Design a protein with these regions (language model features):
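Phosphate-/nucleic-acid-contacting segments
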Residues: 5-8, 12, 16-77
Length: 77
C-alpha cells in the first residue's frame, strides 16, 4: 500500500507538469494538503513522499516554488 501512495503522488505530479523544451515543470503550487486529498493519503505521508522524491532526484524545487520533474529518475525506481 505504501508504494501505492508513491505511485499516486508521482501520477499527480506528472499530470500537473507542463513540457517546456525537454523539461517538465509544475508552475502552479499544489499544497501538501491538496495533494493528500487528491491521492487519499495524510498530509504527513505526502510530505514524506515529496521529501523522498527530492532526495532521489525525481523532483527539484526551483526558486519561486515551481517543481522540476526528472521522469527518467522516476522510471528507474
Amino acid at each position: 500500500a505504501l508504494m501505492g501512495v508513491y505511485g499516486r503522488v508521482a501520477d499527480v505530479l506528472i499530470e500537473s507538469a507542463t513540457l517546456e523544451g525537454d523539461k517538465k515543470i509544475i508552475h502552479e503550487k499544489i499544497s501538501r494538503q491538496d495533494l493528500a486529498k487528491m491521492v487519499g493519503a495524510s498530509r504527513e505521508m505526502v510530505s514524506r513522499v515529496m521529501r523522498d522524491f527530492d532526495e532521489q532526484g525525481f523532483i527539484q524545487t526551483l526558486t519561486g516554488g515551481a517543481i522540476l520533474l526528472n521522469e527518467r529518475r522516476a522510471e528507474s525506481r
